[in-house]
Design a protein with these regions (language model features):
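Short alpha-helical "packing" element that flanks the helix-turn-helix/winged-helix DNA-binding module
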Residues: 14, 256-262
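Helical "lid/switch" subdomain of P-loop NTPase nucleotide-binding domains
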Residues: 65, 85, 116, 120-124, ...
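N-terminal pre-P-loop "Q-motif" helix
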Residues: 2-15, 85
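Conserved Walker B catalytic segment
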Residues: 110-142
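Pre-Walker A (Motif I) flank of P-loop NTPase domains
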Residues: 20-24
Length: 263
């Protein structure tokens, strides 16, 4: 189960889209949490009995026709004409729906999760578009901004076939919630703001900052604080800061007693 923090609104919106509409595209910059959000949505539907197929597009696979759709294709699929492959994909999805349904009940339409769809090869992208057009599966698609996705991928939202969620960087309060979850306790306001500033709200970078030389929790239950070396300010986020316990501040004393994200 994906551990998702501070994305409740977007998660609820994505679940509604895949349950009551054709599905959704989750778009955003690298590291903002697209994959985690999509994974959490897929896990939720799987717990409710929806069959889930997870597909990951890669830069290496982009040169190979239908590479990303391997989980839905027979091993000899590349021997067939490309025009026949989308039909194979849809038959495979229909088979999943039938196998997941108790006798006498309507088939449960599966969820097709496509991660990093901007890296799909053109053939796989066209097959995905056909699946959505034919309502053969619910679709949950992540797209990194700044790339050049295939036209068939951009058509998913430009033609109104799927909803689109633009995932923004975390705000200060959301960053505080993530830090409390990762560190397992309250975080000094100054620490939350420093890490949020350094990461610019990027969830992946923020998590890396926490992991980098995180130290140990204070035995007195002190809040966490951050030590930022000036020479690291221009470095990559994972090298800028080290999280250490705020031993000088205790719950109920001074400014450090304010809850993370409050200022």
């Amino acid at each position: 189960m994906v551990d998702l923090v501070a994305r409740d609104v977007e998660r609820d919106a994505a679940i509604r889209s895949v349950r009551f509409a054709a599905g959704t595209v989750i778009a955003g910059e690298a590291g903002v949490g697209k994959t985690s959000l999509a994974g959490s949505v897929a896990d939720t539907l799987a717990e409710r009995g929806v069959p889930v197929v997870r597909v990951l597009a890669t830069a290496a696979g982009r040169a190979i026709p239908f590479a990303a759709l391997g989980p839905l294709l027979p091993v000899d699929a590349r021997d067939f004409q490309p025009a026949l492959v989308p039909g194979m994909v849809m038959r495979s999805l229909a088979g999943l729906a039938t196998r997941a349904t108790p006798n006498g009940k309507p088939p449960v339409k599966p969820l097709l999760l496509v991660d990093d769809a901007q890296l799909l090869d053109d053939h796989s992208a066209a097959a995905l578009l056909s699946v959505v057009h034919q309502h053969a599966a619910r679709a949950l698609v992540t797209v990194r901004l700044g790339g050049r996705p295939p036209d068939a991928v951009t058509a998913l939202w430009k033609d109104g076939l799927l909803d689109r969620i633009d995932l923004q960087p975390l705000d200060l309060d959301e960053a505080g919630a993530l830090l409390r979850s990762r560190l397992g306790g309250d975080v000094a306001t100054v620490t939350t703001r420093a890490l949020w500033d350094h990461s610019q709200g990027n969830a992946l970078y923020l998590t890396e900052l926490v992991r980098f030389r995180a130290g140990h929790r204070s035995a007195l239950g002190g809040r966490w604080r951050v030590v930022v070396a000036g020479r690291h300010r221009g470095a990559a986020p994972s090298r800028r800061a080290a999280a250490t316990p705020d031993r000088g501040r205790h719950p109920g004393r001074g400014r450090g007693a304010r809850r993370a994200g409050a200022g």
